[in-house]
Amino acid sequence: TTYEMDQKLGTEYHKRFTEYMKFVQENDLTVDGAMTDPKGDRSLSPSRQEDPDMYMHVVEVREDGIVVRGAKAHQTGAVNSHEHLIMPTVAMKEEDKDYAISFAVPSDAEGVFMVYGRQSCDTRKMEENADMDLGNAQYGGHEALVVFDNVFVPNERVFMCREYEFAGMMVERFAGYHRQSYGGCKVGVGDVLIGAAALAADYNGVPKANHIKDKLIEMIHLNETLYACGIACSAEGEKMPAGNYQINLLLANVCKQNITRMPYEIARLAEDIAGGLMAVSYTHLRAHETSQDL
């Protein structure tokens, strides 16, 4: 999108972004691609919100950069990220131009702070001898609300500032890549769930029962359909004028549409196969008083 802006407007956004991308790659940095705003009243545009901070916006333009306010919500991996790359979250009109901004800041920039989202079993990980309940201790998932309280962004890290007519293009392209990636990451989780369901059937002594096999086959079919969608939108992409590879946006949307449906059915079938199961903690499995009974 920065390339198209430069071609039409004579700006230097694409050069800035290319230099930033090199900086990220050369320093092996993790970047939080942040698009989702709190949004407030969804029936109103950004500029018509009662609280102007419901969408990220520029509050001051200086000779050497801009000052921004707002927040980005549901940011997976934000606390683990070195940088935050901010993008608009909706297509915009001229009245919303102060909200049409894209920029990058380090996580420790002055005025940036994060509110960590609670997990349903997060305190369980703090129990003594939790071990197995920790999951992947080094790469555990999390989400955070990233707040920007009058944060200064130098010009070299600004990639869009009030070019409202390009906000929709940026949103559509980023969303396409995001939806394409779901054809891989969600399918990987599905593989694990299918394996766990098959193991539960073995434990229950019914791996050869026809209705169990039918359900496992359906789970595999649904999961591989999602994978096929991810492959399709990736393979059907094309080279863009800027030199980057753009996945097929229509097929990426099909991929995400199926992702919003099929994993729930896969999980429902897993519940049918597993039956009632009380999942105790690893601490109880190892405790002398309870281990033998469990």
Where are these predicted regions, by residue range?
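FAD-binding core of flavoproteins
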Residues: P38-C185
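Extended amphipathic alpha-helical segments enriched in small hydrophobics
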Residues: S181-K239
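Conserved small/polar residues in nucleotide/adenosyl-binding loops
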Residues: T283-T290
